[in-house]
Amino acid sequence: MEIILIKPVRKLGKIGDILKVADGFGRNYLLPQKLAIRATEPNKELIVKQKHEFEAKDKQIREEVEKINALIKDQQLVFIRQTSNDGKLFGSVTNKEIADKLSENISYNISHSNIILDKQIKSTGIYTVEIRLHAELNAIVTVIVARSESEAQDYLREQKTETSEDLAELA
């Protein structure tokens, strides 16, 4: 299936790109999500005319996302959970919980589908979590999972010590 992107898509292309994709990917994801349109001759002509409008709209969205990125940068989310004696959680910290807490902290709604977890968080410790804000912009948030507030503070002090040691090595 040949499509024209009307929004930037991560690892696929930018606005106005004409691409050949698998039929199922186009039909089931790109078209319903309004990320692309079919690449017919009238649509190709239309995109050439409207490409500047799409790019201006995307630039506006990107500027808004950069403001959100400034709010998210340096955020530390603390989750207090019950654990077994060896630090394993009874359950896990999910991307939805991270999105909810982050949204609460910055007063802006972040969707759980934008939270990228490499693996499930099932034990206490410090984790870095990637947040996809835009096709071309990701933010990093520190997630601290601990049994108590005091343990979370210990993790934070430990992290600051490691950071200052790393900076001292670079100097």
Curated annotation (Swiss-Prot):
<keyword id="KW-0689">Ribosomal protein</keyword>
<dbReference type="InterPro" id="IPR009027">
    <property type="entry name" value="Ribosomal_bL9/RNase_H1_N"/>
</dbReference>
<keyword id="KW-0699">rRNA-binding</keyword>
<dbReference type="GO" id="GO:0005840">
    <property type="term" value="C:ribosome"/>
</dbReference>
<dbReference type="InterPro" id="IPR036791">
    <property type="entry name" value="Ribosomal_bL9_C_sf"/>
</dbReference>
<dbReference type="GO" id="GO:1990904">
    <property type="term" value="C:ribonucleoprotein complex"/>
</dbReference>
<dbReference type="GO" id="GO:0019843">
    <property type="term" value="F:rRNA binding"/>
</dbReference>
<dbReference type="GO" id="GO:0006412">
    <property type="term" value="P:translation"/>
</dbReference>
<dbReference type="InterPro" id="IPR036935">
    <property type="entry name" value="Ribosomal_bL9_N_sf"/>
</dbReference>
<dbReference type="InterPro" id="IPR000244">
    <property type="entry name" value="Ribosomal_bL9"/>
</dbReference>
<dbReference type="InterPro" id="IPR020069">
    <property type="entry name" value="Ribosomal_bL9_C"/>
</dbReference>
<keyword id="KW-0687">Ribonucleoprotein</keyword>
<dbReference type="Pfam" id="PF01281">
    <property type="entry name" value="Ribosomal_L9_N"/>
</dbReference>
<dbReference type="GO" id="GO:0003735">
    <property type="term" value="F:structural constituent of ribosome"/>
</dbReference>
<dbReference type="InterPro" id="IPR020594">
    <property type="entry name" value="Ribosomal_bL9_bac/chp"/>
</dbReference>
<comment type="function">
    <text>Binds to the 23S rRNA.</text>
</comment>
<dbReference type="Pfam" id="PF03948">
    <property type="entry name" value="Ribosomal_L9_C"/>
</dbReference>
<dbReference type="InterPro" id="IPR020070">
    <property type="entry name" value="Ribosomal_bL9_N"/>
</dbReference>
<comment type="similarity">
    <text>Belongs to the bacterial ribosomal protein bL9 family.</text>
</comment>
<keyword id="KW-0694">RNA-binding</keyword>
<protein>
    <recommendedName>
        <fullName>Large ribosomal subunit protein bL9</fullName>
    </recommendedName>
</protein>
